[in-house]
Structures are given as structure tokens and as C-alpha cells.
């Protein structure tokens, strides 16, 4: 099933001339029920591999690239250009475009230090003069942001049919 196949059709005056055309209402949204997103028996944790796209992953996991939208919806991926992890090559190009030279990529982005109480594995952003502050470069910062996007949940195939059916019902509401 293609993502937009079941979206409602509406009349829209594209150019303001008074001549309306039938168009797919791409502004319609459906959100995954909170209790479903938290129901771990429905989901399998997965780490996205370098270069995997939602379509590749959907083909491998659900048997069709057309279910890429299920993966994106279940993981709140609205824009795959920004919400999906970049491949190694894409990351190199992104860093080059954003920071330019290797020197700028290795410049200080911010400083971090472990929390002093509670879970000390969690780091907090601090000023450079904070005791124990560690430099985090632009490269390291961007790499860490990208890596955090790799952990997702995949809907188990037993629940794919009911999920798609519910989506089709809800999108027409």
C-alpha cells in the first residue's frame, strides 16, 4: 500500500481562478496511539545500519518497500532528510557543507561533564571553565546526533495488517 492511496480527496482551487480540481489532501495526519507506541510486544528494537533507507528496511522487514511509511510513522520520522540517520557519505557531505574545513569540523562545539549526582553516565552541557569539562567538537556533536537516530522500533509483521487497516480508517475520519 502506498502511503497516500487512502488519503481523502478534496476540491482545491490551485491558482485562485475559481476552477477547483480534485487533489489528495496531503495535510491530513494520523498519529500512532500512545498505548500502541509503548506496547513492546508489538515492536522489535532495531539499529539502522549505514546506508539503510526506510524503503530498504521496509522491504527487508515487511516484504515490501511500500511499507516505508509504517516504519516512519511508528518512529515519528516526519522528514527522512533530517529525522533519519545519514550514511557515512551523506554525513561527510553534510559536515563539509555546514563546517567546511577539517579545522572547523574539529573546532569546539560545546563542553560536557558527567552529572555529579544520579546517573553519572549522562553528560550535561557546561561552560568551558567547569571542573572536568570535556571539549566536544563539531564533528563529535554531529556524529552523536546522527547515531542517536539509529535506534528505532519495527512493528512486528503479525500486527502489520491490523495497523494498516486502522490507519486506513483513521485517515478518512
Language model features with spans:
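Cell-surface/extracellular proteins and modules involved
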Residues: 1-173
Amino acid at each position: 500500500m502506498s502511503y497516500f492511496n487512502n488519503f481523502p480527496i478534496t476540491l482545491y482551487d490551485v491558482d485562485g481562478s475559481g476552477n477547483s480540481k480534485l487533489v489528495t489532501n496531503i495535510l491530513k495526519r494520523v498519529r500512532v496511539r500512545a498505548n500502541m507506541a509503548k506496547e513492546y510486544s508489538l515492536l522489535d528494537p532495531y539499529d539502522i545500519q549505514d546506508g539503510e533507507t526506510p524503503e530498504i528496511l521496509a522491504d527487508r522487514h515487511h516484504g515490501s518497500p511500500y511499507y516505508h511509511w509504517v516504519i516512519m510513522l511508528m518512529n515519528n520520522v516526519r522528514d527522512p532528510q533530517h529525522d533519519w540517520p545519514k550514511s557515512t557519505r551523506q554525513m561527510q557531505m553534510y559536515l563539509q557543507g555546514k563546517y567546511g574545513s577539517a579545522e572547523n569540523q574539529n573546532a569546539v562545539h560545546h563542553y560536557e561533564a558527567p552529572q555529579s549526582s544520579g546517573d553519572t553516565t549522562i553528560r550535561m552541557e557546561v561552560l568551558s571553565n567547569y571542573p572536568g569539562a570535556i571539549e566536544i567538537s563539531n564533528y563529535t556533536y554531529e556524529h552523536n546526533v546522527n547515531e542517536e537516530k539509529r535506534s528505532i522500533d519495527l512493528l512486528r509483521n503479525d500486527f502489520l495488517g491490523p495497523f494498516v487497516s486502522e490507519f486506513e480508517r483513521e485517515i478518512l475520519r
